């Protein structure tokens, strides 16, 4: 739910992002991103999962099936890839499932297929957690991470599908 009381939803198998105002009596959902069928062009999505809407109504989408993060500027139907294979091997993602943006506009990505959490910002692309590429062998590794969230102190909490828990 955005600060203006608009609910944004990712329709994974519908390959789109929709929104509805919770203050309106109109119960019509509006399409925000995606065309309703899977695709990889700038106006299409493939199994979108996590979403984030910033204060300027720009929408960030974890486009899981396309292994990328798409940015849709407010009222724009075509997205811009801000992380993913299209930007080169250094920025490659594998099934990203969640995204968060901090006050400094750093983008934090749950890169589920690569078992890691990465940050993309002014200082570039950096792996933060799960960087050793080992799979579930140590306490500081993540196993099939799905979502993540920060608390008010800046600590990160990660849901872990493999171990059915939170790290």
Where does each model-flagged region fall?
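Structural signal for beta-propeller blades
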Residues: 15-18, 67-70, 115-117, 164-167
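Gly/Pro-rich loop segments of beta-rich domains
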Residues: 24-49, 76-97, 122-146
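Residue-level detector of Asp-centered blade-edge/turn motifs that repeat once per structural unit
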Residues: 1-4, 53-56, 101-104, 150-153
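Short loop/turn segments immediately following the C-termini of beta-strands
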Residues: 12, 22, 56, 64, ...
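Loop/turn-rich, solvent-exposed surfaces of beta-rich toroidal or solenoidal domains
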Residues: 90-122
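Conserved beta-propeller blade signature
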Residues: 6-9, 58-61, 106-108, 155-158
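Blade-level signature of beta-propeller repeat domains, shared across WD40, Kelch, NHL, RCC1
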Residues: 143-167
């Amino acid at each position: 739910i955005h600060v203006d009381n608009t609910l944004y939803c990712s329709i994974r198998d519908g390959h789109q992002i929709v929104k509805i105002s919770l203050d309106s009596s109109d119960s019509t959902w509006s399409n925000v991103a995606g065309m309703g069928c899977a695709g990889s062009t700038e106006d299409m999505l493939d199994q979108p999962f996590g979403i984030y809407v910033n204060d300027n109504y720009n929408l960030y989408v974890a486009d899981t099936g396309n292994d990328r993060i798409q940015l849709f500027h407010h009222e724009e139907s075509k997205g811009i890839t801000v992380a993913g294979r299209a930007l080169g091997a250094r920025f490659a993602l594998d099934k990203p499932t969640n995204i968060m943006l901090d006050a400094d506009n750093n983008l934090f990505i749950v890169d589920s297929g690569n078992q890691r959490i990465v940050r993309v910002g002014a200082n570039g692309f950096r792996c933060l957690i799960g960087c050793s590429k080992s799979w579930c062998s140590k306490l500081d590794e993540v196993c099939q991470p799905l979502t993540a969230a920060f608390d008010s102190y800046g600590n990160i909490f990660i849901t872990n599908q493999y171990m059915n828990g939170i790290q």
